[in-house]
Amino acid sequence: MVYNCGTRLERRKKRVRLKLKRNSSLLRLSIFKSNRHFYVQLIDDKCGRTFASASTLEREVVALTNRRVNSDSVKIVAKLMSDRLNKLDNCKKFIFDRGLYKYTGIVSEFANELRSYGFEF
């Protein structure tokens, strides 16, 4: 008998989230990407609160990137997110939740850009 445990992407998402739950004391930086947009949120899972967010839908990003999701637009989103995280107290270390996406392309570009601003994950 064969059991369908979901698609490959759903299994990867579950596997990544399970590993993240082990370190639930830290805040979680969650990303979502589509073919047209890139979204980032800093979430506290204990109280279910979002502290900061940034995306390619914001005016600063749309004006510079012409509604394209590429490494340039992701770098601008990383800059926006780092500015918002610097305003918060004690948010230099968190968990990077890549979700169902592989750590290549714009996901790794975003992570490296945030690390260059002094954040640890």
UniProtKB/Swiss-Prot annotation:
<keyword id="KW-0687">Ribonucleoprotein</keyword>
<dbReference type="GO" id="GO:0022625">
    <property type="term" value="C:cytosolic large ribosomal subunit"/>
</dbReference>
<keyword id="KW-0699">rRNA-binding</keyword>
<dbReference type="Pfam" id="PF00861">
    <property type="entry name" value="Ribosomal_L18p"/>
</dbReference>
<keyword id="KW-0694">RNA-binding</keyword>
<dbReference type="GO" id="GO:0006412">
    <property type="term" value="P:translation"/>
</dbReference>
<protein>
    <recommendedName>
        <fullName>Large ribosomal subunit protein uL18</fullName>
    </recommendedName>
</protein>
<keyword id="KW-0689">Ribosomal protein</keyword>
<comment type="function">
    <text>This is one of the proteins that bind and probably mediate the attachment of the 5S RNA into the large ribosomal subunit, where it forms part of the central protuberance.</text>
</comment>
<dbReference type="GO" id="GO:0008097">
    <property type="term" value="F:5S rRNA binding"/>
</dbReference>
<dbReference type="GO" id="GO:0003735">
    <property type="term" value="F:structural constituent of ribosome"/>
</dbReference>
<dbReference type="InterPro" id="IPR005484">
    <property type="entry name" value="Ribosomal_uL18_bac/euk"/>
</dbReference>
<comment type="similarity">
    <text>Belongs to the universal ribosomal protein uL18 family.</text>
</comment>
<dbReference type="InterPro" id="IPR004389">
    <property type="entry name" value="Ribosomal_uL18_bac-type"/>
</dbReference>
<comment type="subunit">
    <text>Part of the 50S ribosomal subunit; part of the 5S rRNA/L5/L18/L25 subcomplex. Contacts the 5S and 23S rRNAs.</text>
</comment>
